[in-house]
Regions:
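Intrinsically disordered, low-complexity Pro/Gly-rich regions
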Residues: 288-337
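Acidic catalytic motifs of isoprenoid enzymes
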Residues: 1-173, 182-200, 214-223, 240-243, ...
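Accessory, usually C-terminal, subdomains that scaffold auxiliary metal cofactors
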Residues: 218-282
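Conserved beta-strand-loop-short alpha-helix elements that form
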Residues: 208-214
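Short alpha-helical scaffolding segments that buttress acidic/His motifs in well-ordered protein cores
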Residues: 178-181, 202, 269-273
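Membrane-embedded alpha-helical segments that form the functional core of polytopic membrane enzymes
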Residues: 198-208
């Protein structure tokens, strides 16, 4: 399973852990329902954010959950799982982006994909995922051609990139794809006024996804001779870190403009966990599973109880369920940790 937002469940409050798992399992089951058992392989942590965003804006309803049967990944327990348009959009996006990842590995001739028969089979699978994602996207009013076009442009940009090419030129297609996916959640939730700030949050999330993937793969790519945006453009890690920190700040600013019915899980994933993803990629954080002992990672502070879902009420703004408003004491107050 892949994705940059990979929270350790010990850091989530019990309620948020259940919610997060509901969206993760909901994505997996939406893939199976619409595209067959094999499609579940593309289940990923970042895709479920699309489902989380949709529900956070529309509000959770009893119709938005169903009880799933036993699953080995849940120790054969039943569980409530998310269903509906948010989960289906997450499935469509996950299929298209997984297709892009497969084609990227084929282009790099990674492992067995260096063999022509295996590469040909992988290309057929990727093409099938593109078509499947397009069908589901169309049923939801989302044109996955935006994602496919971005993926296709990526190859051309990488071919032309070299020393001195701005790194953000290379990340632009990914930014465009994730901006479109995030923005469409506003339309599914019936909150079109949220589309613009969510597009901005999605654009910066895509930038982070691309940069963190490059940072984490840098040494392996150098050893195998695979293309890496940092190496190709001559970008030092310090500049990549600066761009990541700027993007983190931009995501928070964009989410302040979004009207959520309940933004707690969004806040945990896109404020706290996204910061931890950056720290992890750059080797500036660790993860402790000791109960009752908070620790500091980067700029994030783990609460003493081992969770950091916002407590009852709203620590950042007056609107219930909206953790991105001005901090207590007005705009001049220090930012939350």
């Amino acid at each position: 399973m892949f994705g940059i937002v990979r929270p350790c469940t010990h850091r989530l409050s019990e309620g948020l852990r259940v919610e997060w798992m509901a969206h993760l399992c909901g994505l997996c089951l939406a893939l199976r329902a619409d595209h067959g058992q094999f499609a579940r392989i593309v289940t990923n942590y970042d895709g479920l954010i699309v489902s989380v965003l949709t529900e956070a804006q529309a509000g959770r309803t009893p119709e938005g959950r169903r009880t799933a049967g036993p699953c080995p990944l849940r120790a054969m327990r039943t569980a409530p799982v998310a269903k509906g348009e948010g989960a289906r959009l997450a499935a469509a996006v996950s299929l298209v982006l997984a297709s892009a990842k497969v084609r990227d590995h084929v282009a790099d001739r990674d492992g067995l994909l260096a063999r022509r028969p295996v590469a040909a089979a992988a290309r057929r699978v990727a093409a099938g995922w593109d078509r499947a994602g397009a069908r589901t996207g169309a049923a939801l009013g989302f044109d996955t051609a935006l994602l496919v076009d971005a993926v296709d442009r990526q190859t051309g940009i990488e071919t032309l990139a070299g020393p001195g090419t701005p790194l953000l030129t290379v990340t632009e297609p990914t930014e465009t794809a994730t901006a479109a996916a995030f923005a469409h959640t506003a339309h599914l939730a019936g909150k079109p006024q949220n589309a613009a700030p969510l597009a901005e949050a999605g654009r910066l999330f895509g930038r982070l996804a691309h940069l963190l993937d490059a940072v984490e793969d840098r040494e392996a790519d150098a050893a195998s001779g695979a293309w890496n945006p940092l190496t190709a453009t001559g970008t030092p890690l310090s500049e990549a870190r600066r761009l990541c920190d700027d993007a983190l700040h931009g995501v928070r600013l964009a989410l302040r403009e979004v009207e959520f019915a309940d933004g707690k899980l969004v806040h945990v994933l896109l404020a706290h966990e996204l910061r931890r993803s950056v720290d992890r990629a750059f080797g500036t954080s660790s993860c402790s599973h000791q109960e009752g002992q908070g620790h500091q990672e980067g700029r994030g502070l783990l609460l003493p109880d081992g969770s950091f879902g916002p407590q009852p009420g709203n620590p950042y703004g007056p609107q219930p369920g909206h953790p991105y408003g001005p901090p207590p004491g007005g705009p001049a107050a220090p930012p939350p940790p």
